[in-house]
């Protein structure tokens, strides 16, 4: 699996461990309550002569729930817990160094089914090692 996909899966595992109203998946929001993430425009912040690099992954987090408070609590918890961690997961050739908030969770709309939708974005800084 690629470094980017491994790092995203590791972040998803951290979110799932929070015990929110839903586990998180990749892709688009479905018809029911849920949380999803996907990588947005991203790239290396620094590249070294040995080709190790710092990647900045812009990770979009979207959520949907019939109860706005439940959704807001989940989205804010994701940001608070991920950005306040002191230890992040890593793999054989990569290590998450830091996670910061790019865009705070914000309400972006309501579906005809009365489900609220919120969106946010995280910067996931990953050090890759060849």
Predicted regions and their residues:
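Mid-chain, well-packed structural core segment of small domains
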Residues: 66-88
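Active-site-adjacent structural patch at catalytic or cofactor/ligand-binding sites
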Residues: 55-64
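Short, charged interaction patches at domain edges and termini
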Residues: 1-13, 42-54, 94-130
């Amino acid at each position: 699996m690629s470094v980017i996909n491994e790092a995203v899966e590791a972040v998803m595992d951290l979110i799932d461990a929070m015990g929110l109203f839903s586990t998180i998946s990749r892709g688009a929001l479905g018809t029911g309550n849920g949380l999803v993430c996907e990588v947005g425009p991203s790239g290396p912040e620094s590249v070294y002569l040995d080709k190790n690099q710092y990647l900045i992954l812009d990770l979009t987090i979207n959520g949907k729930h019939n109860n706005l408070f439940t959704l807001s609590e989940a989205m804010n918890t994701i940001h608070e817990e991920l950005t306040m961690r002191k230890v992040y997961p890593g793999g054989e050739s990569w290590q998450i160094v830091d996670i910061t908030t790019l865009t705070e969770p914000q309400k972006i709309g309501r579906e005809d089914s009365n489900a609220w939708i919120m969106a946010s974005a995280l910067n996931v800084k990953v050090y890759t090692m060849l």
